[in-house]
Amino acid sequence: NDGDMHKYHGAFIIGLLTDKLHIEGPIWKERTSFSFSARAIPTLFFKNLIVDKDDTYSDKYNYYFYDVNAKVNHKFSDRSRIFLSFYKGKDHYHYDSYYHGDNYDNSIKNYSKDNSHLNWGNTIAYGRWNYVFNSKLFCNTTVSYNKYEMGLDGNMEDTYTVANKVQDRYYYSSKFNSGIRDWSARMDFDYTPMPQHHIKFGAEYIHHTFRPGIATSKIQDIDNGALQEDTVYNTSNSHAMRGQEISLYAEDNFNVNARFSLNAGVRTSLFHTQGKSYYSLQPRLSARYDLGQGYSAKASYTCMAQYVHLLSSTPL
């Protein structure tokens, strides 16, 4: 929804799982409009969703998410229009646990703590300019920014004290962060030289920044009152990996006659990262024949290339 250019209206909905808000209307009547929407789970406003506790222990859990979407649409003329958009979404989960025990006179105490936090989310911003050259040709020019982030941290601690002096203690904490950030610019043309031909062509540039992982951990161990270990480990990949991708494409949807149509196209791309370049040519061809009475026969050939892959390990 790009926003109503004539009047203001909106809605606020309280649901069992999510609450929603939507507002839209004109900024400059018949020229500029806006649209804003937001969604959240009600647990966003609670510190803890589930609490289980008694005199010696407590377990606390919570999960929430939210996302917001804002758009502005401006009409310069009947041939020129610009669209601006912003999106942000985030999910969060946390768990906290605590246990403690002591003897009858509190001279001996034992307690343990455990907590973990997991966050992930996306941020997207883009602007698109639509320009109509004539009745046969128009163009969309788009600039965008996309960022994904994930973070995980947690710690655990077990402590045993006698007469308020620590005899045994084990502490472990860890943090992990990763993310992907893309900047891109593209131009897409739509050309109809005659009724039988519908041609699309364009170009795109993407700058990738990958942060595969930044991990740190700390271990502290006390045994019989003596420090056995106090170490910080850093397995960070502090150097971001960058890649640049350039691509060109063209395709033609050709209606040969009332029953037979062809779609032929090609995409060529170049990916450069860490001093190396990778090139690919990706042709495609499809044909469709209308058999009548709602039936058709189709055949196609496509060659595609993917430069970035997700590698994951599966425990046996």
Residue spans of the language-model regions?
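Face-selective signature of the C-terminal outer-membrane beta-barrel domain
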Residues: N73-D91, S116-Q274
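Transmembrane beta-barrel architecture of outer membranes
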Residues: T18-K20, S33, F65-N69, N122-Y126, ...
